């Protein structure tokens, strides 16, 4: 299930890590009872458009009519209004969320973004809500986790650097116990048994303080280009972590992941570099 980290608050996801799912259909009431159940969908949609995500979750459990009204259209006025209230104008105006097809998906991505309370003291999350900025602090490696982690289901997110990589730039996953700051310039993700990472600088896979081989496993693997979006795929059913570049599946990087709550995470060393992470939901192939 999805487990909220610090900063997720009442807006964290449901059992599948969906975030903006507003409750599951199996839990919805069996019918449309009472005055609310008889209200036309357009009236309900108008009322729902003033509610916050936690309130929408409760509404989705009232009856099937309310559930269908909320989930029948992911671009409805309900989700458009919530998206406009929850997300920064910059996030909606730029191409940060260009791969998300609906307002509901954008709200969900925000609930799964970097946590402002679970990152190194040397980084901050920009006003757009999705981009990490590392301050120019010497001899420090700094990371961040997302607000919500996963212990079941299949999940995908994309991450990209918007500045120099430096000597180490790692993307991957971490438990809540993995440190998000250390002295020196090191591969923080993968430095212990609580995190798994791919160093985009030298293409090494890292876990438990050891190099687990190069990735992707091919001759003359291309180096990461600044601005290039890497898709990360976490499968908690098969206990694997895989990566994609563009439309190319690069392969499974890690197998045998533990049955624990795992969070999308990054670590960086270069001063004033920026890293953006956007949660996509369930992988398209699944």
Swiss-Prot record:
Using the record's annotation, list all stretches that form the B30.2/SPRY domain. Answer: 92-284
On whether Cell membrane is a keyword of this UniProt record, the answer is yes
Reported phenotype of the disruption mutant: Homozygous animals die soon after birth due to respiratory distress. Embryos show abnormal innervation of the diaphragm, impaired synapse formation at neuromuscular junctions, and aberrant development of axon fiber tracts in the brain.
Report if keyword Protein biosynthesis is assigned. no
GO MF term (any one): ubiquitin-like ligase-substrate adaptor activity
Where does it live in the cell? Answer: Secreted; Postsynaptic cell membrane; Presynaptic cell membrane; Nucleus
**Keywords, ordered alphabetically:** Acetylation, Cell membrane, Cell projection, Developmental protein, Membrane, Neurogenesis, Nucleus, Postsynaptic cell membrane, Secreted, Synapse, Ubl conjugation pathway
Predominantly, its location class is secreted
> Gene3D superfamilies annotated for this entry?
1.20.1280.50, 2.60.120.920
Pathway named in the protein's UniProt entry = Protein modification; protein ubiquitination
Protein name stated in the entry:
F-box/SPRY domain-containing protein 1
Q: What is the lineage of its organism?
A: Eukaryota, Metazoa, Chordata, Craniata, Vertebrata
Name the gene for this chain. Answer: Fbxo45
């Amino acid at each position: 299930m999805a487990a909220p980290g610090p900063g997720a608050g009442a807006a964290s996801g449901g059992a599948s890590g969906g975030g903006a799912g507003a409750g599951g259909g199996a839990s919805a009431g069996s019918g449309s009872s009472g005055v609310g159940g008889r209200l036309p969908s357009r009236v309900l949609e108008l009322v729902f458009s003033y509610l916050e995500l936690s309130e929408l979750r409760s509404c989705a459990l009232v009856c099937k009519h309310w559930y269908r009204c909320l989930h029948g259209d992911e671009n409805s006025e309900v989700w458009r209004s919530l998206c406009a209230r929850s997300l920064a104008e910059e996030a909606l105006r730029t191409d940060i969320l260009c791969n998300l097809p609906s307002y509901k998906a954008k709200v969900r991505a925000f609930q799964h973004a970097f946590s402002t309370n679970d990152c190194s003291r040397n980084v901050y999350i920009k006003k757009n809500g999705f981009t990490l900025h590392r301050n120019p602090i010497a001899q420090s490696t700094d990371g961040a986790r997302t607000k919500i982690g996963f212990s079941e289901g299949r999940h995908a997110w994309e991450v990209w650097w918007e500045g120099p990589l430096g000597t180490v730039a790692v993307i991957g996953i971490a438990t809540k116990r993995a440190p998000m700051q250390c002295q020196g310039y090191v591969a923080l993700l993968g430095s212990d048994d609580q995190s798994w990472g791919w160093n985009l600088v030298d293409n090494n896979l890292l876990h438990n303080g050891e190099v687990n081989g190069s990735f992707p496993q091919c001759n003359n693997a291309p180096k990461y280009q600044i601005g290039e979006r890497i898709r990360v795929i976490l499968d908690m059913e098969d206990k694997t972590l895989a990566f994609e570049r563009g439309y190319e599946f690069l392969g499974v990087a890690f197998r045998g992941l533990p049955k624990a709550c795992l969070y999308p995470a990054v670590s960086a060393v270069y001063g004033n570099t920026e890293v953006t992470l956007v949660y996509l939901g369930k992988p398209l192939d699944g």
